[in-house]
């Protein structure tokens, strides 16, 4: 089933051990491939946004508007913050993948 990214803005994001926030944006690479969800951690970690790879999604329920990530809350809490002012370059991606202990998509 294909869905517009507009439809998924605001979807609730669940870690393996609880809610972490909502989808607030998407990041695509220079080949226009969707690589990351930007998550607004809202009430849980006020003011913090994080980028999580679409490869780390374990399931999506469009009826409940929920995306389940294959990551624990503590790891997200300790992870690199994302901001619109920050250039999403290979150095940032390398740190991101190393922190979450997932292999980078470019290797």
Locate each region found by the language model:
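Peripheral interaction segments used for macromolecular assembly
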Residues: 1-107
